């Protein structure tokens, strides 16, 4: 029986770089991806019959749900925001950060009361779930795509819901973390049909990737 290819979608940027380092550790390198001048869209390890491609983070769960990719590696923030029908199978332990509610110190008291406040965010689904289902606070959510930190500074919102790594950008703009929504990191996701049809191969990859997280 001829073995088909497994396809892996990687979220562009640092996560993809770290993910490929992990794949290399378990004997699945992809030298084609190291060529910075390449215009290729699909990268192949012929020996292992595995194809890789890079995609914008929010698109990775979509590729996986619809079967264009069997496996995806993407941040937990994207998984929560997109809400796709996929299996989340492994926390890779890198790309760690936090989803937080941030704003000026003066906004802290607004998070304790019943007053309707405005929340600017790139993640409306996560923000809505946090405020409505966990805090039971009514808010107006404003979806933005650019620098979220700008919103409370210019009076568009009282607080923001955004990813925080070091907090330096917040501090430089007179903002601080007021509440933590949830911790985040890179995750492995799998297409539901692929998990059944290619269970042995996918399980072997997951097991290998899991072994790379032990030293982290």
Segments (PLM) and residue ranges:
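Domain-level signature for soluble enzymes in the chorismate/prephenate branch of the shikimate pathway
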Residues: 1-216
């Amino acid at each position: 029986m001829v073995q088909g290819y497994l396809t892996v979608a990687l979220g562009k940027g640092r996560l993809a770089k770290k993910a490929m380092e992990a794949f290399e550790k378990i004997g699945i390198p992809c030298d084609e991806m190291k060529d910075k001048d390449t215009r290729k869209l699909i990268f192949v390890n012929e020996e292992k019959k595995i194809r890789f491609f890079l995609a914008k983070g929010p698109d990775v769960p979509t590729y996986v749900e619809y079967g264009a990719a069997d496996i995806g590696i993407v941040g937990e923030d994207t998984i929560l925001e997109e809400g796709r029908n996929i299996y989340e199978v492994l926390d890779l332990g890198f790309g760690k950060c936090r989803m937080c509610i941030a704003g000026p110190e003066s906004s802290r008291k607004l998070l304790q009361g019943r007053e309707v406040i405005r929340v600017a965010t790139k993640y409306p689904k996560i923000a809505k779930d946090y405020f409505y289902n966990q805090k039971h606070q009514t808010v107006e959510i404003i979806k933005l795509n650019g620098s979220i930190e700008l919103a409370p500074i210019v009076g568009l919102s009282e607080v923001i819901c955004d990813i925080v790594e070091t907090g330096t950008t917040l501090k430089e703009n007179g903002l601080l973390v007021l509440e933590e929504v949830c911790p985040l990191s890179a995750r492995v996701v799998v297409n539901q049909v692929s998990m059944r049809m290619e269970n042995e191969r996918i399980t072997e990859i997951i097991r290998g990737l899991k072994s790379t997280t032990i030293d982290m």
